[in-house]
């Protein structure tokens, strides 16, 4: 199984707006499970750490293989979510690995 992990840090904005953006992003990501068959499992977590190096959101998703990850990457619903991510995310880190 292939694990795809993405950690994101949102752009600096007022606390309430950041909270709204995080909730919207989490909702958009969680909805992908309903549209992309190759996506076998997905978890979205919102950070509660106050460390200055902490990211704001983590996405953990599982795929059978690299073909499934590619189907996810180019799927219209995922591309739509990426458009929102580009608007609100300042930094993202990705790790893909086999389990």
Give the location of each predicted region.
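C-terminal structural segments of small proteins and small subunits
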Residues: 66-92
């Amino acid at each position: 199984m292939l694990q795809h992990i993405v950690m994101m840090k949102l752009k600096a904005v007022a606390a309430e707006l950041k909270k709204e953006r995080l909730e919207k992003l989490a909702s958009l990501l969680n909805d992908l499970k309903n549209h992309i068959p190759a996506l076998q499992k997905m978890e979205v977590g919102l950070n509660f750490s106050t460390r200055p190096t902490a990211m704001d959101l983590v996405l953990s998703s599982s795929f059978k293989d690299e073909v499934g990850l590619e189907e996810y990457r180019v799927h219209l619903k995922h591309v739509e979510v990426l458009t929102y991510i580009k608007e609100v995310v300042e930094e993202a880190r990705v790790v893909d690995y086999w389990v």
